Amino acid sequence: MLTLSKGASFRPHYAVLKLPHLHKKWMAYIHDPYPFHYYPRPYNWVEPGYDFKELFFKELSQKAKYSAFPSQLLKEWMSSYFPDFSKTGIVIPHQNEKYEVQNTSFPSYFDISKFNLLHAGNLMKQRSPEGLLKGFILFLENNPSAKEDAKLILLGDASYHTEMLKQYNIPEIYIHNGNKAFDEVYHLQKNVSVNIILEAKGEISPFLPAKFPHCVEADKTILSLAPYYSETRRLLGEDYPFWSEVDDVKKIASLIGKLYQLWKQNPDSLILSRKDLESYVSVTHLKEVMKSLNNNQ
């Protein structure tokens, strides 16, 4: 029996916790830190009734046969608060499901012949794109000719950063502060030069971004802007060259410059080419994980 969580709701977990006869076959999936005050900085949420939620999760960690997490770092993070998770925890990353884009036409703001960098996804208060924007501007200053063929595209709700974003109203940057159709974004991810994964500034980011499997499938170079200790960086590898702290403007500019030079030499050279990650986020891997649990019973 698998119980899933959504947002701040763990109601299915709470319900099964009250049914002891199901505990021996129960897998509790935990998608994010909980209670919310266990989020790493810069997140600083404290919910009403947090003490009750701590007791609830302590009991859950002790009673569920298995606990499942989308990332290794999240499993370790939650185990530091509830040690039983280290015994019962397994990692089930977000998977890719085969999907055919219905609308294959490109939007007016996208020119496939350009050096396009895309960040797709909501920019929460803690995920500021300012370092990326400053880094891109510095890249343009260092490479004046790039103004003819480079474009940074930001798609997704960024209401916390609206005023700051107004400062970057230039032709080389396209910002859509709001939602776009999945088809449109998914199609762009597969056709841009670089996909950007931007995370909050902090000491650690134990989350596996939901778009990570899409970026892996797109097979385009990923520019990872994340803490040194992050699940994205862990999966890409310590030696992955296109990683920077989210606010290191000079390094971001330098990395974009290197990517731009590679693109100028051969626009088709900016591929991710990570069969190991494609396998990791596949349904086949999920089946292998579940089979191993059955074999260990």
PLM feature segments, named:
Residues 246-254, 261-296:
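A charged, aromatic-enriched C-terminal amphipathic alpha-helix characteristic of glycosyltransferases
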Residues 59-89:
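A short, active-site helix/loop in glycosyltransferases that binds the activated sugar's phosphate group
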Residues 73, 94-95:
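Carbohydrate-associated surface elements
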Residues 108-127, 133-136:
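Conserved donor-binding/catalytic core segment of Leloir-type glycosyltransferases
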Residues 11, 34, 47-67:
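Membrane-proximal helix-turn-helix segments that form the acceptor-binding/catalytic region
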Residues 1-23, 28-31, 36, 244:
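An aromatic- and histidine-rich active-site surface loop
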Residues 127, 181-187, 195-214, 223-234:
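Nucleotide-sugar-dependent
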Residues 147-156, 160-186:
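Nucleotide-activated donor-binding/catalytic signature segment of Leloir-type glycosyltransferases, i.e.
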